[in-house]
Amino acid sequence: MPSPFPRRRCLPGDFSPSVDSRPCSSPCELPGPTGKLFLGGTPPRALRLPRRLAWCSIDWEQVCLLQRLGAGGFGSVYKATYHGVPVAIKQVSRCTKNRLASQRSFWAELNIARLRHANIVRVVAASTRTPAAFDSLGSIIMEFGGNVTLHQVIYGATGCPEEDGPPCSAGEQLNLEKCLKYSLDVVSGLLFLHSQGIVHLDLKPANILISEQDVCKISDFGCSERLEDLRFRPRHHLGGTYTHRAPELLKGEPVTPKADIYSFAITLWQMTTRQVPYSGERQHVLYAVVAYNLRPSLSAAVFTESVPGKKLEDIIQCGWTAPAQQRPSAQLLLLDLRALQAELG
């Protein structure tokens, strides 16, 4: 069976930007002082890469793992340093129930490999050749965007179930000014992505990091797509979180940037209400979203107590309207949010 991934997207796994070009054995673990884990050695047939290609290989001698930040269906994320700089390392697990989906997730993360924007988590380096200790399909070193996600800010340090589950305690109070600041960060990131022909397709609070400078950065591009790629092949599998998935995607219609606008509207609603979007069984929610235009309630006091609150409600409603073509673009959404921010002074 031919590989589902085009050859042009294969990383040069036999290369590493090492200071020398000596061949060596498989990478090994070297315990460092203070209990940190250093990864020594370089892959076989290692050669020095030109600087312009340094992003598509990892110098494992410069990696120091600090702690595991979390784990998901496709692997684990670690806090680490790379060349002495704080980073996050995502390891795509080899032992998953759906290996093909794991491979797709790895390559999707690299859709943003050469992009730079203040509100997008930057890819520093990536490789399909990893130390044996990881037992992974591939590794991606990313900018360390922060220890906190927007999900944790909204729902508290312990987080909150994204699907059905017990009630959660809210996090810190997010006033309208803070909601708008974070919204402008996120939409600025979306505008840049869409201008590059990329759709995220899994935008939600858990995938938005907040840096020490209080800047939101969009992360986790494992479901992302390049629009130009979709012209040549259908998208058979739609990942992402069902509570934030646009109704046209649930119906199998074409992917457009407007799907991210829908997800943002749900996210903005979460910021302003600090509630979970839906309760009830997943299949019932999916059916109601498509067949009956089910949306989260807009009855919260924040939408009725002031003129700015009412305008925020209008922005949310426009963002999650069912006909995708009627939703605003990221550019128009950014203008509306800036106007509302100016109104608040």
Swiss-Prot record:
UniProt GO BP: chromatin organization; ERK1 and ERK2 cascade; establishment of meiotic spindle orientation; MAPK cascade; meiotic spindle organization; negative regulation of metaphase/anaphase transition of meiotic cell cycle; oocyte maturation; positive regulation of ERK1 and ERK2 cascade
Record field: catalytic activity: L-seryl-[protein] + ATP = O-phospho-L-seryl-[protein] + ADP + H(+); L-threonyl-[protein] + ATP = O-phospho-L-threonyl-[protein] + ADP + H(+)
Any GO molecular function: protein serine kinase activity
This protein's record includes keyword Nucleotide-binding: yes
Catalytic residues as annotated in Swiss-Prot or TrEMBL: 202 (proton acceptor)
Tissue specificity note: Restricted to gonadal tissues.
A single Gene Ontology CC term: cytoplasm
EC numbers: 2.7.11.1
Domain of life: Eukaryota
Annotated InterPro entries: Kinase-like_dom_sf, Prot_kinase_dom, Protein_kinase_ATP_BS, Ser/Thr_kinase_AS, Ser/Thr_Kinases-Pseudokinases
Physiological role: Serine/threonine kinase involved in the regulation of MAPK signaling. Is an activator of the ERK1/2 signaling cascade playing an essential role in the stimulation of oocyte maturation.
Known partners and oligomeric status: Interacts with MAP2K1/MEK1.
Record family assignment: Belongs to the protein kinase superfamily. Ser/Thr protein kinase family.
Annotated protein name in UniProt: Proto-oncogene serine/threonine-protein kinase mos
Gene for this chain: MOS
